Amino acid sequence: FDATVDYKADDWRRQLKEATPNGIDVDFENVGGEIMEAVFARMNKDGRVALCGLISGYNEDEPPPGPRSFGNLLIQRVKLQGFIILDYYARFGEGIRQLSEWVGEGRIKSEQTVVEGFEELPRALNMLFAGENTGKLVVHIES
């Protein structure tokens, strides 16, 4: 990564602009909503978007409106492709082996938020959609 932006900060738009003075070449999109719109508006010519999720709208009663900055994707000739994890089911074993190796080598740092107890599942799910966890959200159930 060249830079990061705290999407929960009040000044995330300023952070995004400062972090991308020359625009954005690649977006690994998992959130959607306002941040995706702001990123789309800053995409460079021949940029690429890997659309892997849109979690900001998963709990909405009505689908969110389309991005207002969608026209920039056309003008900049951006390539947008959706990716679903099940498309790579045949490679899960390979992925687990490689990722485990990288974690063991310290090349990938794994952070977790652990919630204790089966009865806390509803709270944990709400935490997930509210972005209140760091890293993976794990519910530990005593056996």
Where in the sequence are the language-model features?
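Terminal helix/beta-alpha structural elements that buttress the NAD(P)+-binding lobe
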Residues: 1-143
